[in-house]
């Protein structure tokens, strides 16, 4: 279900503070965050944000096409390695 348009998009306060600080300094550095639920807003464009996937932080470069999506959409948490082999010997 989509968030109501009456509300602003959710962005974690610590993440918003870091983005605004880097924008005023005009610096680019990797921002480490665990906030996968934060929505990407236009002030984040051009920054690299390392999003936690449960094991490590994956660096994601924010582009204009990502605006409106959540940070967690770009850091997959599951790593599918294929189905188990059909081992008939173990069925005995």
Swiss-Prot record:
Pfam families the UniProt entry points to: Ribosomal_S19
GO cellular component labels: chloroplast; mitochondrial small ribosomal subunit
Organism in which the protein naturally occurs: Morus indica (Mulberry)
MF terms in GO: rRNA binding; structural constituent of ribosome
InterPro entries (alphabetical): Ribosomal_uS19, Ribosomal_uS19_bac-type, Ribosomal_uS19_CS, Ribosomal_uS19_SF
Biological role: Protein S19 forms a complex with S13 that binds strongly to the 16S ribosomal RNA.
Main subcellular location: plastid
Record's subcellular location: Plastid, Chloroplast
SS bond list: none
Keyword Ligase (UniProt): no
Similarity-based family: Belongs to the universal ribosomal protein uS19 family.
GO biological process: ribosomal small subunit assembly; translation
UniProt name for this protein: Small ribosomal subunit protein uS19c
Keywords of this entry: Chloroplast, Plastid, Ribonucleoprotein, Ribosomal protein, RNA-binding, rRNA-binding
Lineage: Eukaryota, Viridiplantae, Streptophyta, Embryophyta, Tracheophyta
PROSITE patterns found in the cross-reference section: RIBOSOMAL_S19
């Amino acid at each position: 279900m989509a968030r109501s348009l009456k509300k602003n998009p959710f962005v974690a306060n610590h993440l918003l503070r870091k983005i605004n600080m880097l924008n005023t300094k005009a610096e680019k550095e990797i921002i480490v965050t665990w906030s996968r639920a934060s929505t990407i807003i236009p002030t984040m464009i051009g920054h690299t944000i390392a999003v936690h996937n449960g094991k490590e932080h994956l660096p994601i470069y924010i582009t204009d096409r990502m605006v409106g999506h959540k940070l967690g959409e770009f850091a997959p948490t599951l790593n599918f390695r294929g189905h188990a082999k059909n081992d008939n010997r173990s069925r005995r």
